[in-house]
Amino acid sequence: MEGESTESTQNTKVSDSAYSNSCSNSQSQRSGSSKSMLSGSHSSGSSGYGGKPSIQTSSSDMAIKRNKEKSRKKKKAKCTQAQATISSSLEGAEEQPHSSGTTCDQKILHVLATTQQLGDQPSSLDHKLGEQLEARHNCGVGKAEQPQSFSLPCPLSVSTLMPGIGVCHGGNAPGGKWEKTFESCKLDTGPAKTERVKEDSFCCVISMHDGIVLYTTPSITDVLGFPRDMWLGRSFIDFVHTKDRATFASQITTGIPIAESRCSMPKDARSTFCVMLRQYRGLQTSGYGVIGRSVNYEPFRLGMSFREAPEEERSDNYMVANSSNMLLVICATPIKSSYRVPEEIHSQRSPKFAIRHTAAGIISHVDSAAVSALGYLPQDLMGRSIMDLYHHDDLPVIKEIYESVMKKGQTAGASFCSKPYRFLIQNGCYILLETEWSSFVNPWSRKLEFVVGHHRVFQGPKICNVFETPPNSEPKIAEELQNKNTRIKEEIVNLLAEKVSRPSDTVKQEVSRRCQALASFMETLMDEVSRADLKLELPHENELTVSERDSVMLGEISPHHDYYDSKSSIETPPSYNQLNYNENLLRFFNSKPVTAPVEVDPPKVGSSDVSSTREDARSTLSPLNGFEGSGASGSSGHLTSGSNIHMSSATNTSNAGTGTGTVTGTGTIIATSGTGTVTCASGNMDANTSAAFNIAANTSAADNFGADTSAADTSGADTSAADNYAVDNYGPGNFGAENSCADNSGAENSCADNSGVDNSRPGNSGADNSAADNFGADNSGPDNSGADNSGPDNTGPDNSGAENSRAENSRADNSRPDHPRPDISGASNSRPDKTGPDKSGAENSASGSGSGTSGNEGPSSGGQDTRTTAGTPDSPPVSLTESLLNKHNDEMEKFMLKKHRESRGDRRTVEKNKNKTTNTIDSLKILEYSSTGPGHGTKRGGSYSWEGEGNKPKQQPTLNSVGVGTGAPEAPIPPVHPTHTTHTAIAQSSFSAQQSLFPTFYYIPATPLAASTPAPGALSPTPRNQKHHHHAHQHAPKVPDQASTSQQAAGPAAIPLQYVTGVMYPHPSLFYTHPAAAAATAMMYQPMPFPGIANAMQLPEQPSTSQSNYSKTVFSVIVAPPTITTTTATTTPKTQGAFHSITPAQLQRPSSQDTSVKTEPASNATPSHSSNKKKANSSIASGIGDYNSNQACSRNRANVKKYTDSNGNSDDMDGSSFSSFYSSFIKTTDGSESPPDNDKEAKHRKLKNITRLSSKIMEHPEEDQTQHGDG
């Protein structure tokens, strides 16, 4: 090995080929050679391949200094050995391992022998080997050079070209030598050619990490002339022509992403492209000249594929990295000219190649098959104008061809063949082409996009080697001809830029064909799409209120799949249209009631307060003003007179006498907040109210009757009517008619309320009633309220007289399932007896809705016990129409959905409370009788039902104590100033919304001349004079003319009860019927606030003036500790229209009324168990005892607040959406249910409840039961 290495070194020095080869480490070390210097690589032997230092650096320098003579002698001496080595190397180059020193020597000898053959005479070879070896050797060398003659560029020496190509011969070697070599090769082409096919291409492996060549096949020496080891460790791109490096790089970047999928790409998948590779500039090709020689490039077609490098190391030559890496495998095949002889004629079977250019003539695509025919690589032609490649003499023909192209372009896919024309190739010659032309026209713009020519060579060039460098000189063309050619080229380009016209017949055919296709498609489409698929599926009607996405609230998942299930009926209120109030409304319309009384001369009233003029009454009557907080202006006298103007009943001012007010029509008396205000007539109510007020005073007289009333009277369906009052209640006669009027109606109302949990809820009298003074003792008329209010009377068909018919009265009660009787539908009405028209009358007096005469008994202290009845037969028919009702239904449906979502969070307590139904009812009763503190006298009425007993009203004892505790004794009220307090309809259900569900409502005044309408939003019932409301067992201080509200008395303990004369439903009442509406059968909608959320609920106050207009008190009831401020408000008169939309903002209490009470969860009055569950942290958390008139007065009377729900959304919406006129027809679930509160607060409230129990005095609890239950 060492000897061979030394010999190799010597050969290298002698050859003076500027190459030093060493076999040590199987690496070819390269010294500074002329090739290296010219190629720009400048890599010396010190660089070494594979990072190994060269051991031949010093000898390399010496080798350059060797003289040529000595080297020639050495070569001659070694000629025989070299020749033998060459033959063996040529035959078995692929098989021999290149790691041995012998192989290196053989390669070196091969180079030397080739050089000697090229430079010396053939006689030297003949002398050593013989003619046969020489012929064989010459043949091999000739075949090795022959393929290069067609592929080498023009700069190659002429000696490498075939003779007869048409180029001059010359060069360093004698021509005879080459001719002989060529001829000898031709004689032996058969076997030699087969052998050379294997050597026609080479492969190399390149690392994608750094682009270094890791492996090459031995055939690279035959193809490019490089020794095999020359490329190892070199960058492949160094051997690529500069102009082709961008193409090579682009192919690499596009191929890498594909290769990274690795297994997904087939093994044989390749990308092919053409580049020029540098040839070896050894002595074999370039002779001995080193300086001044050009670098020659040869075209190759490269097939590129990616592989994953193997993990293990192979032979030293493999040079594979230890770590896994991507490898690029390139197989290079030389591209040779397709022409053998000059100007040869090709047959029709010659291959075609395609060139595509745009309308501007710019070439956009060239087939790789065109390289051998044109000599251009695809990247050489891309971006050039094809017009430059046409022969200038053929441009007119080319123009005709393109005109034909434009014509054929009218038909998609049309093609044609043109006459032959000349085309310029790379070596500067022209070839004759036959082309099949086609084009593509944009169907939208109708412009030519590109032209494709499929070319076939008809005649070859004069110079067969198409890769030869073209001559520098260009043919000279006359300037005139050049201008002409330029003009023709421009015309061609302009022609291609024009729009392609289409024949009209073609257009028509295409349109017809497309129309037919469209019609066929539509028929198929219609067959596929059936009508059933187009059906719009709407949810079931009762699903409208139960949205699945709304079922998840407050962490509770309660999808209501069975909406008729008993449980879901508790948690999910029925659809608005499912409520049975529609039936009652229809019955109301069928009864053809007269609810809008005609203006009549006011009856003479015996009260000084009635002295006000009719004009004053009219001015104060405006329903808008009355219902807004600002409406009712004027004194109580105005109210009284205004109400009396249209009252057909006499006002009984006698304290003892029983003034019988004849109730013409149905004067529904809804006693509110125990003021005993009898709203017999719409609008007259105020007068009644004032009467009621008087009653208040009377009530105190009635105190006596208080117990009685609540006792039997109330219980007695009829009794509770006027009877009770007349007899028991008014036994004392204090209340006389009034009591019966106001009280009764009050009591009654409250009765209904009180007795009917629901009733009370619907809240005519609501808790109020019960709380109300009326209910104080008067309330005792649960009966009263019971029977009367809801009294069939009120509702009673008779009552329905005008007022009875009132949807409200009759409806409210009637609708209540409890009161099976339609007439009785009134909560109190539910009592069959009440249905009697007369009773109704009596009750009307009592309940204010009776059409009969009401015995106005009782001293009306300070006022007229005015028993005013409105609704004379002269009045025009009601303006409520079914169309209006339908519209209302739709709006109510939407609003109920909204409120239902807001209140759903409170329904979770239903199940818990269900088990506590009895206890809850008892606790409610206890609350009604709370005797300590100012807050007592809360009366709860209304039907209290569960799934099983949804239509059965629960019986409840009436509060005999007047709930009008004087929380603020400092604020006295003039005795004759009856303050009309609206019943606060606080839902006892689990509804959490603290504002009225329907904040706005319409009021159709029955008597347009009524002085003023009460602001139904006012929650604080005005007590009658304390002496009247105070029972013996009530401990509230008796302050005459005290303007304390019933909520003052019952504030903390009051459970918001809503009283509406109507049927009880198993879910909380959603609507509140205003007393005025009940009295005059006018449509009035009162917002009903629902407690249960910490937000303070600003309850509107009722102007005192409006109270005097209606001799009916609405009992303000508070459902629980939820924070509710109830006040009695006085407002200025404001003219109102027939339809008046009242919003909670309008009901805001002005500061003029000092009787505002704040309820606190922990107040003295103990709420029921359900009420204990109310939010303890109410925004208004001040005790009733802390209240004083200054607090009430401190409020800015202009500070009008709208009801807002728990989310702060205002309920001040369209008035039509909030009609509570139908509140009495809404089913209600158990009224005592309220959202659960923290256990701590609940326990605290229970303690208070127990305290209330001990102090409560129930006089006739059995008589206080809801009369609906009896009926």
Swiss-Prot record:
Compositional bias (Basic residues): 65-78, 1025-1036
UniProt keyword Repeat present: yes
InterPro entries: PAS, PAS-like_dom_sf, PAS_fold, Period_circadian_regulator
Modification after translation: Phosphorylated with a circadian rhythmicity, probably by the double-time protein (dbt). Phosphorylation could be implicated in the stability of per monomer and in the formation of heterodimer per-tim.
Record's keyword terms, sorted: Biological rhythms, Cytoplasm, Nucleus, Phosphoprotein, Repeat
Comp. bias (Basic and acidic residues): 805-822, 831-841, 885-896, 903-913, 1257-1271
Pfam families membership: PAS, PAS_11
Domain notes: The run of Gly-Thr is implicated in the maintenance of circadian period at different temperatures. Deletion of the repeat leads to a shortening of the courtship song cycle period, and thus could be important for determining features of species-specific mating behavior.
Record protein name field: Period circadian protein
Organism: Drosophila pseudoobscura pseudoobscura
